[in-house]
A protein has these predicted regions:
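Active-site-proximal alpha-helix that buttresses catalytic centers in soluble enzyme cores
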Residues: 1-129
Length: 129
């Protein structure tokens, strides 16, 4: 159960795909985060081609009582979606709800993430195939 101090939420934001199976790793990531952080609401949103949309996910989090949302873009690099689309979605959601938003950097901006990916690639490539 969430603590009474829970007013913040985490919104994982990914691109989306017309292939429903594409979302499976993101659903697993959401579950892993929820298991580690039981004091925040966690939701998943997609830019296009699959639900929930950014606006739909924000509405879900607002209904749960969130007044602050940290957006975690699940993009390896900063491109047009992070430079243009995401800020526009956040501004529209803020105007509609009054919720305060904070955006984490793209995954590739994290040295820790780059090291984790590098370690995984080396380890996976060394396995007998």
């Amino acid at each position: 159960m969430m603590s009474s101090r829970t007013k913040s939420a985490l919104l994982l934001f990914a691109h989306g795909s017309s292939d429903p199976g594409w979302a499976a790793p993101f659903v697993k990531l959401k579950a892993a985060i929820q298991a580690r952080d039981k004091d925040r609401f966690v939701e998943l949103a997609f830019l296009e081609r699959m639900p929930p949309s950014f606006g739909e996910a924000v509405a879900i989090l607002q209904q749960q009582g969130a007044v602050e949302i940290t957006v975690a873009p699940i993009f390896l690099a900063i491109g047009g979606h992070m430079r243009k689309d995401l800020p526009a979605l956040i501004e529209a959601a803020h105007q509609r709800t009054g919720i305060k938003f904070r955006v984490l950097p793209a995954l590739g901006e994290s040295g820790e993430m780059i090291e984790s990916i590098a370690a995984w690639v080396v380890h996976a490539s060394d396995r007998d195939g």
